[in-house]
């Protein structure tokens, strides 16, 4: 249901906006769910996937495999995971691109900015549904 007059709900426009989105917006669009352990620890459901995160593949041909993220290729919407590869006819290996929706984050690479993002997301989820005004 459309709620805002100036925002389009047309499917073709939403698809165009999604596939033509710039790199800094693709980062948040390429988010994956956290594992149950991390979700209970940080009180956050999902995070953008980043290089050196450890992931579990939960969908597709490589379901059940674990590995470390070696590359997040935003332009192609692809995430490359260590040891998830095939060989070409000449024997050279190439990495299989995965979607963020196929992955669950099991271990995060934390630094200052990522830690602050986790605390901000947890705080906003805690106040969700409450009034923001102070009486």
From Swiss-Prot:
Region of interest (Disordered), residue spans: 1-23
Cellular component GO terms, alphabetical: large ribosomal subunit
InterPro entries: KOW (IPR005824), Rib_uL2_dom2 (IPR014722), Ribosomal_uL24_CS (IPR005825), Ribosomal_uL24_euk/arc (IPR005756), Ribosomal_uL24_KOW (IPR041988), Translation_prot_SH3-like_sf (IPR008991)
GO biological process: translation
Cystine pairings recorded for this chain: none
Superkingdom classification of source: Eukaryota
Record's keyword terms, sorted: Ribonucleoprotein, Ribosomal protein
GO molecular-function terms, A-Z: RNA binding; structural constituent of ribosome
The family this protein is said to belong to: Belongs to the universal ribosomal protein uL24 family.
Protein name as it appears in the record: Large ribosomal subunit protein uL24
Lineage, broadest ranks: Eukaryota, Sar, Alveolata, Ciliophora, Intramacronucleata
């Amino acid at each position: 249901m459309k709620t805002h007059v100036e925002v389009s709900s047309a499917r073709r426009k939403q698809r165009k906006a999604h596939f033509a989105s710039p790199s800094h917006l693709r980062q948040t669009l390429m988010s994956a769910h956290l594992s149950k352990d991390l979700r209970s620890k940080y009180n956050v459901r999902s995070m953008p996937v980043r290089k050196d995160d450890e992931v579990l593949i939960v969908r597709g041909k490589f379901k059940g495999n674990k590995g470390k993220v070696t590359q997040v290729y935003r332009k192609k919407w692809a995430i490359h995971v260590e040891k998830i590869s095939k060989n070409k006819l000449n024997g050279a290996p190439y990495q299989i691109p995965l979607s963020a929706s196929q992955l669950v984050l099991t271990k995060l690479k934390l630094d200052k900015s990522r830690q602050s993002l986790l605390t901000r997301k947890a705080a906003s989820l805690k106040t969700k549904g409450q009034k923001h005004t102070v009486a």
